From Swiss-Prot:
The chain crosses the membrane at residues 7-23. Residues 24-435 are lumenal. This is Probable xyloglucan galactosyltransferase GT19. It comes from Arabidopsis thaliana. Glycans are attached at N140, N203, N277. One of its GO terms (cellular component) is Golgi membrane. Expressed in roots, hypocotyls, cotyledons, leaves, stems, stamens and pollen grains. Signal peptide: none annotated.
Length: 435
């Protein structure tokens, strides 16, 4: 049963959506000659609340997962890290669907007429809805995930869906795409739901936190960090702090794992850091922030300060290739060190252009470290200081592209494209190229 605070939060959301947002959307009259919105109109499909707002009441229903209720605050950004901050929140990436929904309501080219739209946004909280299939009573019915949505799309104004066979539809799924890729024919069911395996959804675009090795429907977008500035001065103030921060440590690993005896990249990192710290008494070469058991998930203070003090942030794959810490590190101006392309280079092509990776990151193949004796320390120390400075500046330049600014931001900050803006641009380009 939802807590009292959750019910209060939901009441605020209902008030916001039905008494504030709806008139704003309808007041945006369409002009066929509006050059700024040519090929950029988006229609937000009106879905029954069971597909979005009602799902928020399940925020504490699954004991095996974290209680998401506290992180519904501030339209999904979570509670502030402290009362006086204007930019830092305890954000849970699983609420990206809610964050994106709130932000797209500010998109300047919304149209109430689906026939004029280049893209149709489905405000369906697929990741939150998937919890009942992953951890709840519908565990053995995971192949049904999406059937209710499909039935609605094909029965309520079916011409919107059928006009382009779903090619112009997109949604956000705040989990790795693997979690929605269980084959429909597997019996007994394995991990995940079958949403992306449904033939009817093959044409839509899904914005996920991580894509598969052979993405067709999905495109990975950055994990939300805890940094959500609301004005340009706050962003510029943070960038100044990042630039003047003293980088007293060569490299940092913030994460868990690596404690098993079997060879893997996280174990190699831990062993190298332990060895370095045992022999170095003056210069700090390797810093380690233990984030085991999820203790860092909603506490950015644990890792942001060490990231600000490090030149390089190690980003080894874990249970899945991608890491939220990649984007935490970029926000801190910490140069990412990758050990396989699937961690970022092959994932976030809209936000981190593949052709520019060498300008702001270092790649060391994990096989070289685990099996061939390559020391990470040696590779990083061989990079000239001037090159490190230049790379850090490129990381800082990338910062706005991977951050999610706060809803209701100032016009000055809105002129800088953030992760949502770039995702929308990518979706529109993708749809236009396909239809």
């Amino acid at each position: 049963m939802a807590s009292k605070s959750t019910v209060t939060t939901l009441t605020i959301f209902f008030f916001f959506f039905f008494f504030f947002i709806e008139p704003k959307v309808q007041s945006q009259q369409i002009s066929a000659v509006d050059s700024e919105c040519t090929n950029r109109w988006i229609h937000i499909r009106t879905l029954p609340s069971r597909f979005n707002l009602d799902l928020l009441s399940t925020c504490n229903r699954y004991p095996i997962t974290d209680d998401l209720c506290p992180y519904l605050a501030n339209h999904g950004l979570g509670p502030k890290t402290h009362t006086r901050t204007r930019s830092w929140y305890r954000t849970d990436p699983l609420l990206l669907e809610l964050i994106f929904h709130r932000r797209i309501l500010e998109y300047p080219c919304l149209t109430p007429d689906p026939n004029l739209a280049s893209a149709i946004y489905l405000p369906y909280y697929a990741g939150i809805d998937s919890l009942r299939y992953l951890y709840g009573p519908d565990l053995n019915s995971s192949a049904d995930h999406g059937s209710d949505l499909l039935e609605f799309l094909t029965r309520d104004q079916p011409e919107i869906w059928s006009r382009r066979s779903g090619h112009d539809h997109f949604l956000v799924m705040a989990r790795p795409a693997w979690d929605f890729s269980q084959p429909l024919t597997v019996d007994p069911p394995i991990w995940g739901t079958s949403f992306l395996e449904r033939r009817e959804f093959f044409n839509l675009t899904a914005l996920t936190l991580e894509s598969r090795y052979w993405p067709w429907q999905e495109q990975a977008v950055p994990y939300p960090t805890s940094f959500h500035p609301h004005s340009l001065p706050f962003l510029e103030s943070w960038i100044r702090r990042v630039r003047r921060s003293r980088r007293t440590s060569l490299m940092l690993f913030a994460g868990g794992g690596g404690t098993s005896s079997s060879p893997n990249i996280r174990r190699s990192i831990r062993l190298e850091c332990t060895s370095i710290n045992a022999t170095q008494s003056d210069n700090k070469i390797c810093d380690f922030v233990d984030c085991s058991n999820g203790i860092c998930e909603h506490d950015p203070i644990r890792f942001m300060r060490p990231m600000l003090q490090s030149s390089f942030c190690l980003q080894p794959p874990g249970d899945t290739p991608t890491r939220k810490a990649t984007f935490d590190g970029i926000i801190a101006g910490c140069i990412p060190v990758f050990f396989e392309d699937q961690t970022a280079k092959m994932q976030y092509k809209w936000h981190l252009p593949e052709s520019e990776f060498a300008e702001f990151s270092v790649t060391i193949p994990k096989e070289d470290v685990v099996f061939r004796g390559v020391r990470i320390q040696d590779v990083l120390m061989s990079i000239p200081k001037e090159e490190v400075t230049r790379m850090r500046e490129r990381v800082i330049e990338m910062m706005p592209r991977v951050m999610y600014r706060r809803h209701g931001a100032s016009m000055g900050l809105m002129n800088k494209k953030d992760a949502v803006d770039i995702a929308i641009d990518g979706v529109l380009d993708r749809i236009i190229s396909r239809v």
